[in-house]
Amino acid sequence: MSLMLEPNPTQIKEERIYAEMGLTDEEFAMVEKILGRLPNYTETGLFSVMWSEHCSYKNSKPVLRKFPTTGERVLQGPGEGAGIVDIGDNQAVVFKMESHNHPSAIEPYQGAATGVGGIIRDVFSMGARPVALLNSLRFGELQSPRVKYLFEEVVAGIAGYGNCIGIPTVGGEVQFDPCYEGNPLVNAMCVGLINHEDIKKGQAHGAGNTVMYVGASTGRDGIHGATFASEELSESSEAKRPAVQVGDPFMEKLLIEACLELIQSDALVGIQDMGAAGLTSSSAEMASKAGMGIEMYLDDVPQRETGMTPYEMMLSESQERMLIVVKKGREQEIVDLFEKYGLAAVTMGKVTEDKMLRLFHKGEMVAEVPADALAEEAPIYHKPSKEAAYFAEFQQMKMETPKIENYKETLFALLQQPTIASKEWVYDQYDYQVRTSTVVTPGSDAAVVRVRGTEKGLAMTTDCNSRYIYLDPEMGGKIAVAEAARNIVCSGGEPLAITDCLNFGNPEKPEIFWQIEKSVDGMSEACRTLQTPVIGGNVSMYNERSGEAVYPTPTVGMVGLVHDLKHVTTQEFKQAGDLVYVIGETKAEFGGSELQKMLHGKIFGQSPSIDLGVELKRQKQVLAAIQAGLVQSAHDVAEGGLAVAISESAIGANGLGATVKLDGEATAALFAESQSRFVITVKRENKEVFEKAVEAIQVGEVTNTNEVTIHNEENEVLLTANVDEMRKAWKGAIPCLLK
C-alpha cells in the first residue's frame, strides 16, 4: 500500500481498521489518549505490533511474575535478549529458547530455519559466541501425509540453517500426539559462552549518540509476523505466508563474526536483534530501557524492494538485522568493520533525551510516539480462569493397571512408538560435531559441550511431557522441570537455570488460562526447590486450529555445569559384570503414559505424582556419586518406564545386555511412569561405597549376552529380548513411518 493509499486517522477509527491490525476498541481508545489525538496509519501499526501478545505478554505477564528469576549465579534475568548465568573463572553461559510455531505451520522449512536464526541473534546480541543449538518439536501422528511433510520440512529447515552457520545442533526432543496435527510446535534454543566484561545490553544511552542499522536489507517479508503469532490458525492462515520470514544463514554467520568483533570496540553503546516487530521493537525497547528517545530517518534504511512505506519498513521482520547505538563521531570505524565482512552499516538516527520515538520519511515526520508507551505500557489483562471440566473427572478416576498378555511384544511395541523411538533420523541431518567441542552427542539424557580452555563442560537438555500437563497442569509443570534437571544430573552436570517456552491454546478461553496458571505454579515451585531460576523465555499462545488447542506444552530448556569433564556420564551400559541399580520406587502410575496411549489411543486419569523434596535428595545423591567416580552409566526413567530405560541403556552399548529382577506387579514394574527414578550401573568393586552414598536397590547386572532378561520377584522370566532386535525396532520405527 503506497503512502497515498493509506487510510487517514479518521478512516482508521471510523472503519475500525485498527481491529484488522489486532487492536481492540479499548486499546485503540488508550492509544488515542496516550497521543492526545488519533494515530496515523504508521503509528497504529507500531502500537498493534508492540501490544500484541507476542511482543507485550499482555495476557501472560501476571502469571510470569510468579517465576523465581534470581539466584547467586544469575547475571541477567528476563528482560534482555537472553539470560546469563555465571559458571566461574570470569565466564558465563548465555541461553534462551523461543517458539516459531505459527510460521512453521504454514511454511515449515523457512519457519523452522528463521526460528533458529532468531534465537542465535538473541544470544550473540548479548556479546556471547553461540556454541550449541537444541530444539523441542511437537507434531501430530506420522501416519498423516501432512504431518510427514511438516516433520520432514521442519527438520530440514533446522538442519539447513544450523549446519550452514556452523553451530552444532546437539540435542532436543520430538513428541507426537494427535492434538498437534494442525498446529506443530517448533521451539529452538541457543546456548552461548561469554566473558563477564563482554556482556552487552540492548539499551540506547547517551543523547546525541548515533543509531545505526547493520546487516541484511529490509524487504516485505514477515510484516505483522508478531500479530500473526498472536491469533489462532485457521483455514485462511495459508494466505499469511508473507508473514513468514526468509532466512540466509551465510549472512548470519558473517553478522555473528562482525558483531563479536564490534563488541570488543569501546565505540559500541548498545545492541539489539531486530526480531519480532523488527525495527519497531528494537528501537522502542532500546530507547525505553535507557529512559531515552530515538529519532530515525527511514530513507536511510537499506531496502531490497522498491517503494516501501514507513509502515512496511518499521514492521518488516526481515532476518539477519541488528540495531546498534554507537558513540557520536565513531561511525566510520563501524562502517569499516562491517564492510570487512561485506555487510552494510548505515547511520539512520540518533538518541534523544525526550523519550519519544520519532520517524522521518521524505522530509516529513511520519510518527511521534512515546517509546515507553510502545515498550512498557501495553495494557495488562487479568484473564478469567476456570478449572478445566475434564480435570475433576480425571482426578476421580480409579487408576487401573492395564492387562497385558505378552510383555516382550509390548516392550517392542513401545520401543517403536515415535515418541520413544530413536530420533537418529532427525539428528543425523544435523551437524552436531562442528566446532569439535561436543563431548556427548545427541541420543543420551543430555548433550554436553566442552568449555574451551578449561576442564569444564555445559550439559543441556529440553524437556516437557505435555500429556502429564494436560491431565494435571500443576503436577505436570513440576515434572517438566524435574525431568530436565534429572537429565542434566545423569550427564554429570549441576543444574543451573532454565529458559522456557510456554506453548498454549487461546488464553481468552478460561480453561486454557487455568492451564497456563497451574502449570506455571508447578514449574515455579520446582524451580525454587531445585534452585534453577528462570532467566528468560518466551510465550506462544493461540496454538489452536479450528478451535482445538494443543496440549499445554511449557517446554523447559535447562543448562547445567559439568565441573570436570571426567564426570561426564552417559546412559549406555559400559561393561559386563557391572551392577544395575534402580533409584526410586515404582507405583502403578499409567495416566498419560506411552502404554496408556498405545493401548487406548487416548490419555486419561491422573498424571504420575512427584515429591520435589524427594526428587532433590535423589538428584543430589546421584550427582555426588557421579562426581566421586562411582557411576558407570546413568539414565533417567521416563516414557515407557523401567523396561524401556533398561533397554535403551543396552541398545546404546555394543554387545552388552542385562539380567534384572523387578519386584511388584509386573505391568507396573515394567511400564509405569513413576517419577524421580534412575537406572544406574556401578563397578562391582564400588558396590559398598555406592550403597552407603545412595539410596538404591540392586536389581541385577550387566551381561555380555546381548540380551535383556527381566524376572519378577518369584524369579519367573517376564521377558527376554535380543538387543540387536530391539535396536533394529527402535531405530527403524520413524524411517518406516516416513516411507
From Swiss-Prot:
Coiled coil: none
Keyword Magnesium: yes
Active site: 54, 100 (proton acceptor)
Catalytic function, reaction form: N(2)-formyl-N(1)-(5-phospho-beta-D-ribosyl)glycinamide + L-glutamine + ATP + H2O = 2-formamido-N(1)-(5-O-phospho-beta-D-ribosyl)acetamidine + L-glutamate + ADP + phosphate + H(+)
Keywords per UniProt: ATP-binding, Cytoplasm, Ligase, Magnesium, Metal-binding, Nucleotide-binding, Purine biosynthesis
GO molecular function: ATP binding; magnesium ion binding; phosphoribosylformylglycinamidine synthase activity
Residues that, per the record, bind Mg(2+) 2: 122, 273
Compartment(s) where it occurs, according to its Swiss-Prot or TrEMBL record: Cytoplasm
Function, as annotated: Part of the phosphoribosylformylglycinamidine synthase complex involved in the purines biosynthetic pathway. Catalyzes the ATP-dependent conversion of formylglycinamide ribonucleotide (FGAR) and glutamine to yield formylglycinamidine ribonucleotide (FGAM) and glutamate. The FGAM synthase complex is composed of three subunits. PurQ produces an ammonia molecule by converting glutamine to glutamate. PurL transfers the ammonia molecule to FGAR to form FGAM in an ATP-dependent manner.
Similarity-based family: Belongs to the FGAMS family.
Protein's UniProt name: Phosphoribosylformylglycinamidine synthase subunit PurL
Gene: purL
